[in-house]
Amino acid sequence: MTKIAFIGVGKIGQTIAFNTIMDGYADEVMIYDIIPELPEKFEHELRHALASKRLKVELLSTNNLDDVAGADIVVITAGKPRKPGMSRRDLFVDNAKIMMDLANKLPKKNHGAVYIMVSNPVDMMASVFARYSREFVISTGDQVETMRLRAYIAKKLKIPVYRVNGFVGGEHGEDAVVLWSTVTVNGKPFSEDLGVTKAEVEDYVKKIPGEIIRVMGGTTWGPGTIIAELIRAVALNENKVMSIATPRQFEDEIIHVSVPTVVGSSIGPSLENLLDEKDRWNLMASMKDFYNVYKENLKHLETSIQAQ
C-alpha cells in the first residue's frame, strides 16, 4: 500500500499532486494546506478527475497537520513562492522558519517516511528540514534543470528528446552546472559540431526559469510533471537515474547538492565517481559555495528568530 502526503497545495503542489494521483498507483493521498477550504475544494476537483479516469484513490484533505499520519512519502511544497526578480536564496529566512515548524511536527506521525523537498530554495530547505528533523530528506534538486537541458538540445538539433541524455548537478537554480561528461546525443558524446554550443545550452538552462516566471508568474507544468516522476520512482522502486540532492556530510553540516543518483525505494548509489575530473571539480566548487552561503543564511535565521 502506497500512502503519499502533500504538504502545501498551491500552484506547484496542486500540479504535482494531480500528476501523481492521475498515475493511479497511489492507494491513499493526504492533502494539507494552511489556507482554509483549499484542501477540501482541491479534493473535490481531484475526485471529479478520478471519476473521469475511473481510478480509485483514497483522498484525505485537511487544514490540521495532525491528520497527516502514516505516510510512506511526504512531499513538501509549503512556503512563500518565488516572485519575479527574486532569487531562491532571498526566500531562505521566511521559508526556513516554516521548515523548522514542519520538522518539529511531521516526524511525530510519519517517522521513517521519505521526505521530498520542493519548497525553494529547495536544496537549502532540504538541509534545514534534515537538520531539525533528523529524518531522511531528498531535494528535487537539478532534475528539472536536467530535463530543460535535454529538451533544449533536442529542440535545437530537431531530434526526439529521448535521443538526448545527460545531467545537471550542483545547487538547484542559477548556480547549477551542466555535467558535460554525461551529455550524449544519439549515444555519442556531445560535440559543438552538432550545431549548438555549450555556452548557449548553459545560458538557456540558467535563464529560462526567470523568463517563464516573468511572463507566467511561476514555473508549474514542467516541474510538476518532473517531480511527479520522482515520486513515482520512489514509490514503485523504479531505480531510475535522476539528478536529485541527497544528504551528505560537508564539514560540520549535512547539505544537499545534486548528483546523478539511482532513485528507487532506497536512494543511491550516486554516479559521482563516473564523472570526469572537470565535472567533479565543478561539483566540489558548487558544494563549497553552497556550504558557505548556507552557513551565512543560518546565522541570519538565528538572528531573525532571536529578534521575534
UniProtKB/Swiss-Prot annotation:
<keyword id="KW-0816">Tricarboxylic acid cycle</keyword>
<feature type="binding site">
    <location>
        <position position="120"/>
    </location>
    <ligand>
        <name>substrate</name>
    </ligand>
</feature>
<dbReference type="Pfam" id="PF00056">
    <property type="entry name" value="Ldh_1_N"/>
</dbReference>
<dbReference type="Pfam" id="PF02866">
    <property type="entry name" value="Ldh_1_C"/>
</dbReference>
<feature type="binding site">
    <location>
        <position position="82"/>
    </location>
    <ligand>
        <name>substrate</name>
    </ligand>
</feature>
<dbReference type="InterPro" id="IPR022383">
    <property type="entry name" value="Lactate/malate_DH_C"/>
</dbReference>
<dbReference type="GO" id="GO:0030060">
    <property type="term" value="F:L-malate dehydrogenase (NAD+) activity"/>
</dbReference>
<feature type="binding site">
    <location>
        <begin position="8"/>
        <end position="13"/>
    </location>
    <ligand>
        <name>NAD(+)</name>
    </ligand>
</feature>
<feature type="binding site">
    <location>
        <position position="95"/>
    </location>
    <ligand>
        <name>NAD(+)</name>
    </ligand>
</feature>
<dbReference type="InterPro" id="IPR036291">
    <property type="entry name" value="NAD(P)-bd_dom_sf"/>
</dbReference>
<dbReference type="InterPro" id="IPR015955">
    <property type="entry name" value="Lactate_DH/Glyco_Ohase_4_C"/>
</dbReference>
<dbReference type="InterPro" id="IPR001557">
    <property type="entry name" value="L-lactate/malate_DH"/>
</dbReference>
<comment type="similarity">
    <text>Belongs to the LDH/MDH superfamily.</text>
</comment>
<dbReference type="GO" id="GO:0006099">
    <property type="term" value="P:tricarboxylic acid cycle"/>
</dbReference>
<protein>
    <recommendedName>
        <fullName>Malate dehydrogenase</fullName>
        <ecNumber>1.1.1.37</ecNumber>
    </recommendedName>
</protein>
<feature type="binding site">
    <location>
        <position position="88"/>
    </location>
    <ligand>
        <name>substrate</name>
    </ligand>
</feature>
<feature type="binding site">
    <location>
        <position position="148"/>
    </location>
    <ligand>
        <name>substrate</name>
    </ligand>
</feature>
<dbReference type="GO" id="GO:0006089">
    <property type="term" value="P:lactate metabolic process"/>
</dbReference>
<dbReference type="GO" id="GO:0004459">
    <property type="term" value="F:L-lactate dehydrogenase activity"/>
</dbReference>
<dbReference type="InterPro" id="IPR001236">
    <property type="entry name" value="Lactate/malate_DH_N"/>
</dbReference>
<comment type="function">
    <text>Catalyzes the reversible oxidation of malate to oxaloacetate.</text>
</comment>
<keyword id="KW-0560">Oxidoreductase</keyword>
<feature type="binding site">
    <location>
        <position position="33"/>
    </location>
    <ligand>
        <name>NAD(+)</name>
    </ligand>
</feature>
<keyword id="KW-0520">NAD</keyword>
<feature type="active site" description="Proton acceptor">
    <location>
        <position position="172"/>
    </location>
</feature>
<feature type="binding site">
    <location>
        <begin position="118"/>
        <end position="120"/>
    </location>
    <ligand>
        <name>NAD(+)</name>
    </ligand>
</feature>
